Each structure stands twice: as C-alpha cells, then as structure tokens.
Regions:
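Beta-rich, blade/repeat-based domains predominating
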Residues: 2-15, 31, 50-66, 99-130, ...
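Beta-propeller fold detector
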Residues: 44-47, 87-104, 152-157, 203
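A short loop-to-beta-strand structural motif that recurs across blades of beta-propeller domains
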Residues: 30-34, 75-78, 140-144, 192-194
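Mature catalytic domains of secreted/periplasmic carbohydrate-active enzymes
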Residues: 28-29, 60-61, 79-81, 86
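Secretory-pathway ectodomains
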Residues: 58, 66-73, 77-80, 131
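Short loop/turn segments that connect beta-strands within beta-propeller blades
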Residues: 36-41, 81-85, 146-150, 197-201
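Conserved beta-strand positions in repeat-built beta-propeller and related beta-rich domains
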Residues: 20-27, 68-73, 115, 133-136, ...
Length: 203
C-alpha cells in the first residue's frame, strides 16, 4: 500500500512505462517511485531511500541501456536503473556556493534543518551528454555536470535580475527548429521563464 501525496516528476521510458516520482511525509518510509504501464496499470514501485524528498525524475539512454536521473530535495541527486538499483549518488557539489553545505538529515519528516544549501528539484539533459541540475530549494543555482557526472560549472544564484533565480524548478533543453537552442528554466518564485546558452549565458 502506497500513500499518495505530492507528485513532483513524471518520465516515460522507451517502452512507454511511466515513472512517477512522488513525496510522502509519513513516519514509515514508502516507495517514492511508482511505475505504471501506458494504460495506467501498476507495474512496480521502489525508492524508499527517496522518501520525504522525491522531486524531479527523467529518463536517458546511456549506451544500450536506459537510466533514471533523480533529484531528491533532501540534498542529493542519483542515477539508477529502471528498476531502482543505484548507479551513483551525489550530495552537494564541491564548488564555492556550497563550501558550507552539510549532509542533509531529516530529523522530523516535513521539516528542513538550517545550513543545508543543496536541495535539488529538477534535471535537464545537455546535448553534449552532460546534464544540468536546478537547486530550487537550496542556493538557487543551476549546476552543470559532464557526461561522467563531474561538476563543470554553475550559474544563476538568488535574485530577481536577469539571469538570477528564485526557486528554479522545471528546466529543459529547447532545440526546436526555428529557435536558438537554449536551456529554459522555470524561475518559479519570480514567475517567469528564463533562457540560457549551454554555457550558462543569459539570453
């Protein structure tokens, strides 16, 4: 039995299976990723380790296999197989904005401690094989990782001027025809969309 609460991310794999990332604040850990077939029938669930912090999720093919990339606003990002086996898991990046970041620990479900500066909300895949992570509930930066999940840059930060962000949530690489390719960021608290180059320059 899964108690359904806040749904924050939905992704679809090549077979049409739908992966829903949700967050519950129950005292007992529950699976945070629930998988359905294309008709809405339950297939499986997993991810008790994401209990209380489940947020963005997306699917990408690496080589001949698809993987899930997951954001947990308890302070880390992860890559897993489609059945939930963790490939890697990373906490706050070791760059200037996060030098004082501490490992995130949920002492009371639903309540966040002070000093936890990395609280990622969503992910987008870059054309070079890397990816971006939006630190929506943390320090409001967009962090760029290469294809090996190594941090190679960051931009944004808290503010309401051009290129600054407050609670960046949805992000995606927009390469539709007739448009300049750009990373689009849903700058939630500023109630706007912002556009950036792949290198992080504000457009």
């Amino acid at each position: 039995h899964i108690r359904w609460q806040d749904t924050h991310g939905v992704a679809v794999d090549a077979e049409g299976l739908v992966y829903v990332k949700h967050r519950t604040m129950t005292s007992q850990p529950q699976d945070a990723v629930v998988v359905f077939d294309r008709k809405g029938k339950f297939v499986r669930s997993f991810g008790k380790e994401f209990h209380g912090g489940g947020h963005g999720v997306d699917v990408r093919r690496d080589g001949n296999q698809e993987f899930l990339y997951l954001c947990d606003n308890k302070g880390y990002i992860a890559k897993s197989t489609l059945k939930g086996e963790i490939v890697w898991k990373q906490a706050a990046p070791k760059i200037a904005p996060y030098q004082k970041a501490k490992p995130f620990e949920v002492k009371t479900p639903g309540k966040y401690g002070k000093g936890h500066l990395f609280s990622p909300t969503n992910i987008a895949f870059a054309p070079d094989g890397g990816f971006w992570v939006g630190d929506g509930y943390g320090s409001h930066y967009i962090i760029k990782y290469d294809k090996n999940a190594k941090v190679v840059g960051h931009f944004g930060g808290a503010g309401d001027g051009p290129g600054k962000l407050r609670t960046p949530h949805g992000l995606w690489w927009d390469d539709r025809k007739g448009r300049q390719p750009a990373l689009v960021v849903a700058d939630r608290a500023n109630a706007r969309l912002q556009y950036f180059t792949a290198e992080g320059k504000h457009l």
